[in-house]
From Swiss-Prot:
Subcellular location: Cell membrane
Gene3D superfamilies (alphabetical): Clc chloride channel
Top-level taxon in the UniProt lineage: Archaea
Protein name: Uncharacterized protein MJ0305
PANTHER family with a match to the protein in the record: CHLORIDE CHANNEL PROTEIN CLC-E
Entry keyword annotation includes Metal-binding: no
């Protein structure tokens, strides 16, 4: 009996310890998202085509001196985990500041990557400071904290963080710290900014059995586009990596190309959240949607692929939304379910995280969209399995 009490007390202490650690990590993730939101909100020259190359060049100067600031934040964390490199929080914070300026000026990148690197770097510092044992779980918790603050969807982002690292070895026991970190990250962002949802729109959809086959066809269609997007990004990224020139010149070239695209198609600028929201409530011609799709894929590839600090998940969701509405236009039905289908398909395809993709989209858009989200996530994962947008993802 006394031994049982001791064991139970030990479990309570362990749970309390992890709640405390995860909460601290979540606070950093939420604050990172707040910082980027403030930079974007108060940047003096938002979406200025002429400033894009200049800001990209300045960001590249930092990358030349601090390599960890390069490109995708999630990829940087994955590389550090795979190679046992140390992550430092001050560099993660610097990436948040640079990415905020890049997005504000019009770079096609997401805020989730820098937020993830910031919170995961802080988590890694805690891992070393407190001499914790399971570094992988600590890093997963860091990823979840950053995603929770960025997406305002704590459950889906916690699952997404676990799947990105563990894949088929996903263990539900490891969900506890990531969920805590993700919830705290979301709460911090909400309490400071007042923004409760990623998309402040009300959507409704009545499930129809006749849509089932169309959802399957649409998921295959969006998977094909996601595959092309992954190939395009990887090719452009490797091309920039192979250039034997300073990163500031690489990012300058990327900035010039993004500026040219943005001049003709200004809708591709930024994270893509505003554009995704507009797809739900506005009508666009099929020709313009195709141009928008190509422009967003290229703008994202030239932004993050050139080494400019930023994230890939938000632009991927936007590309998925465009893919979904293009399919809807082709069949004569541009309703919201096909946009959600496209987002779930592309999100799952680019991250190889079907469960996280399905839950995240259902959490963001509502339970009415669980069917297209689930179908899209499963098919997107199967169609592009072992091919992701992240270079250092581990299988």
């Amino acid at each position: 009996m006394p031994m049982n009490i001791v064991n139970m007390f030990g479990k309570y202490i362990k749970i309390i310890k992890w709640i405390g650690i995860a909460s601290l990590i979540g606070i950093v993730g939420g604050l990172s998202s707040v910082i980027i939101a403030i930079i974007i909100e108060y940047f003096p020259e938002k979406h200025n085509v002429l400033l894009i190359p200049i800001v990209f060049f300045i960001a590249g100067l930092f990358v030349d001196y601090i390599y960890e600031l390069k490109g995708s934040g999630i990829d940087r964390v994955l590389k550090a985990l795979n190679t046992n490199e140390k992550l430092t929080w001050i560099r993660g914070l610097l990436k948040v500041l640079l990415a905020g300026a890049v997005i504000a000026v019009g770079g096609s990148a997401g805020k989730e990557g820098p937020c993830v690197q910031s919170s995961a770097s802080f988590a890694d510092e805690l891992y070393r400071l407190l001499k914790l044992k399971n570094r992988e779980l600590v890093i997963i918790t860091g990823i979840a904290g950053g995603l929770g603050g960025a997406f305002s969807a704590p459950l889906g982002t916690a699952i997404l963080a676990c799947e990105i690292i563990e894949h088929e070895n996903f263990n539900y026991i490891n969900l506890i710290p990531p969920i805590i970190a993700s919830v705290v990250g979301y709460l911090i962002f909400y309490l400071i900014t007042g923004r409760k949802h990623l998309f402040n729109i009300t959507l409704s959809y009545t499930i129809n059995i006749h849509d089932f086959l169309l959802f399957i066809l649409g998921a295959f269609f969006c998977s094909l586009i996601a595959h092309c997007y992954i190939k395009t990004y990887r090719k452009i990224s490797s091309t920039f990596d192979n250039l034997k020139i300073p990163y500031c010149i690489k990012t300058l070239i990327g900035g010039i190309l993004v500026a040219v695209i943005s001049y003709f198609i200004p809708e591709v600028m930024g994270m893509g959240l505003t554009l995704t929201k507009e797809l739900f409530i506005m009508e666009f011609s099929l020709v313009f949607l195709v141009l928008l799709l190509i422009g967003k894929i290229l703008a994202t590839s030239f932004t993050v692929g050139s080494g400019t600090p930023g994230g890939l998940v938000f632009p991927s969701m936007c590309i998925g939304a465009i893919s979904g509405i293009i399919f809807g236009s082709l069949i004569g039905d541009c309703s919201a379910p096909y946009i959600v289908l496209g987002i779930a398909t592309t999100l799952s395809a680019t991250t190889n995280a079907p469960l996280g993709g399905a839950v995240l989209c259902t959490e963001i858009f509502g339970f009415d969209f669980a069917v297209p989200a689930s179908i899209g996530a499963v098919i997107g994962y199967q169609m592009t399995k072992l091919e992701t947008i992240f270079k250092y993802i581990r299988f």
